[in-house]
Each structure stands twice: as structure tokens, then as C-alpha cells.
UniProtKB/Swiss-Prot annotation:
InterPro entries: DAP_epimerase_AS, DAP_epimerase_DapF. It is found in: Cytoplasm. The keyword Repeat does not apply. Keywords: Amino-acid biosynthesis, Cytoplasm, Isomerase, Lysine biosynthesis. This is Diaminopimelate epimerase. Homodimer. Disulfide bonds: none annotated. Belongs to the diaminopimelate epimerase family.
């Protein structure tokens, strides 16, 4: 048995989840870990690997202004810019492993820094920065305000709204999320050539000004139990269009988040739980 592992590398990890959006988290602060997209795909397999939606790497900061660096890889091995549920798990990991004793930390990402604040043992608040409605060369804030951007889909024009929360989101308002064709439309939009890097597609049902239901088709993943940045994106669109109040409860398949946004010129906040499942190690 020892000879089987002789030329393999041992990697310690934690399995975590935020509203059933699950992660493999690796501490790379003292020892850098390089994983190819091929290895990440193998690890993400729920039958032959660890199984996860995203891999999170905890790295030391390259700046005196931030405490840590946060990296995210989808199950297909592609590195992405943002993951809201992952940010909360990232923060809890730092606490559980004794890597910080601060009540509030600033972390760098592939794009903008995020602030993570520990409210209670498992409830974490993340400053997700201000939503960006200038979506590449496709859509603008005015398109969102006028609700007039559409995508050609199956010989019909589908009205939707585009927004970036550090990563790209397409928000579609529906009468009922229960009956929404999430996988069919989500897959079609995500693969549309107008989105060369893909896009997360969300289906939003507005119950009242303080409560929405949301289902999410995540790029390179498929439908997930929850997506924090998608919840932020959907609420941002609703508030911009004056359909929602500044504090909204978002009901996802995996649980609930609270999204707070006071409007243009201010940051958007996400509040929700994070859970540690187990620690383990694997040889690769």
C-alpha cells in the first residue's frame, strides 16, 4: 500500500458548504498547491473524487492592504472571479483554522477586494461591492432601468437583465420558479456566443418587495442549490427597477440569504450561513 502512494502528493482539505453550494477548501498559505484543470475535474467528481461545486484556495496576501487572497475554481477546472457562498466559507475556514482572530477582514480576489465580517459563529456578512450594470459592450444601466435588453432564444426575444457582481449574471423574471425551464434556458443562454466567458443565469420570482425566490444555472456547473453572487445580482436588478426594497430575503433551493443594498453609489451586502462538514486528505 505504501508503494502506491510513494510518488503521490498528499493534500489536506476541508469540505464546506453555504446553503448546499459545496466546496473543497485548501490552505495554500505556507505551502503553495498547484492543481491542473484535469486534476480539479477529477477531484470534483462526486463518484470518484471528493465532489464539489467549486474549489477554493486560501493564499497569503500579496499586499499590505489585504489579509488573504481568495481563489475560486469551478468543477471544470476554470478559475473564476467570484463566489459569494464561497466567500462565507472562506471566512469560516480562516476562523476554524486559527488563521485570523479579526472580526472583519479584507481579502483580495481575481477582481475587486471583498470585506468579510463575522456576525455570529456561522452567520457571515460579505461586502460584495457595488453592482456594475455596464456589462461589457452588451448592456448598460439604462437597459436595466428600461428593462429592454433581450436575447434571441428559440425564435423568440427573451427579456433579461445583465449585471456584474465581479462575475457575469443574466437575470430573468418569471411568474413561478417552480415551473421555470432552468436547465434548458440556462444552458442555451450560457452557451450563447455573445457571452464568450459564459454567464450565470438566474430565474427570479418576486413574492413581494422584501422576498424573492431564485433558481440559478451556474456557468460550467449547471443548476446549483444556491449561488450567493446570483442572489446579489437578482436583488440589485430588482432594486434598480424599484421592484424591491433595500433589504431582501432570497429563498434558494438550498436555503435563505439576506441581501442589503441602499442603492447607487453604495456597496451591496450579503448575509448568510457557512458550514464546515469535515476535514480530510487525498493523494494525487
Amino acid at each position: 500500500m505504501d508503494s502506491y502512494y510513494k510518488n503521490k502528493k498528499k493534500i489536506n482539505f476541508s469540505k464546506m458548504h453555504g446553503l448546499k453550494n459545496d466546496f473543497m477548501v485548501i490552505n495554500c498559505i505556507k505551502k503553495n498547491v498547484f492543481l491542473t484543470s484535469h486534476i480539479i475535474k477529477k477531484l470534483s467528481n462526486r463518484y470518484t473524487g471528493i465532489g464539489f461545486d467549486q474549489l477554493l484556495l486560501v493564499e497569503k496576501s500579496n499586499s499590505l492592504l489585504t489579509d488573504f487572497h481568495y481563489r475560486i475554481f469551478n468543477a471544470n477546472g476554470n478559475e473564476v472571479e467570484q463566489c459569494g457562498n464561497g466567500a462565507r466559507c472562506f471566512g469560516l475556514f480562516l476562523l476554524l483554522k486559527g488563521l485570523t482572530n479579526k472580526k472583519k477582514i479584507l481579502i483580495s480576489t481575481k477582481k475587486k477586494p471583498l470585506t468579510i465580517e463575522f456576525l455570529t459563529e456561522n452567520m457571515i456578512k460579505v461586502n460584495m461591492n457595488e453592482p456594475d450594470f455596464k456589462f461589457y459592450n452588451l448592456s448598460s444601466l439604462q437597459n436595466v432601468l428600461d428593462n429592454n435588453f433581450s436575447i434571441k432564444l428559440m425564435n423568440e426575444n427573451l427579456i433579461c437583465n445583465l449585471v456584474s457582481i465581479g462575475n457575469p449574471h443574466c437575470i430573468i423574471k418569471v411568474q413561478s420558479v417552480k415551473n421555470a425551464p432552468v436547465n434548458i434556458i440556462g444552458d442555451s443562454i450560457e452557451k450563447n456566443p455573445i457571452f464568450p466567458e459564459g454567464v450565470n443565469v438566474s430565474f427570479m420570482e418576486i413574492l413581494n418587495k422584501k422576498h424573492i425566490k431564485l433558481r440559478v444555472y451556474e456557468r460550467n456547473v449547471g443548476e446549483t442549490k444556491a449561488c450567493g453572487s446570483a442572489a446579489c445580482a437578482a436583488v440589485a436588478v430588482g432594486i434598480a427597477q424599484k421592484l424591491l426594497s433595500d433589504t431582501v430575503h432570497v429563498e434558494l433551493l438550498g436555503g435563505k440569504l439576506i441581501i442589503i443594498w441602499k442603492g447607487f453609489g453604495t456597496p451591496l451586502y450579503m448575509v448568510g450561513p457557512a458550514k464546515h462538514v469535515y476535514d480530510g486528505y487525498i493523494y494525487i
